[in-house]
């Protein structure tokens, strides 16, 4: 990484940047090799960071005053991304057992969906409780989203920090994901490069990606 940055800096041209198709190709290849996610470059949208993706998703998939489901305790910008866009956080708190292992409260999630929420923010793997959600857990959540026609936005930035015997499962590999899943990821955590300001939105649903891109273009994300 350092060598590549030095080589780029020596180019001595620091004008405006534009999307390079090689970036998306490299990203898609990495996710295929490391996480078994089959995604094409045209099914991605480059972003400055994952939090930007959350904010754009709030605007793309809901209207002012709508509620978005989140599962506290969760990374602070989840709630902030909802509130700053004049949406309402609809909490479905995680529950823990006697050993301190956290699980999703599906009854609470469904109650919020029944009440009208049409978007769910998922942290996968979860920050801060360090849960790598199983395929069964994620599929059960997605099935709820499908039943209530809600969009599932999955923050997967910590995908590379899952160790044996646990396994990371991307929401993009679930049955039915092409109907309502948008995933967000970045190299910033894995390679300690948040200053490079590059993340990726991914979806097998062209309409979801187009809606996110439209909000990004309106917000000046280029």
Task: Label each residue range with its predicted role.
Residues 96-164:
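Active-site phosphate-binding strand-loop segment of PLP-dependent enzymes
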Residues 1-49, 56, 108:
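N-terminal small-domain helix-loop-helix segment of the aminotransferase-like
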Residues 78, 141, 171:
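Aromatic/hydrophobic pocket-lining residues that form π-stacking "cages" and hydrophobic walls in ligand
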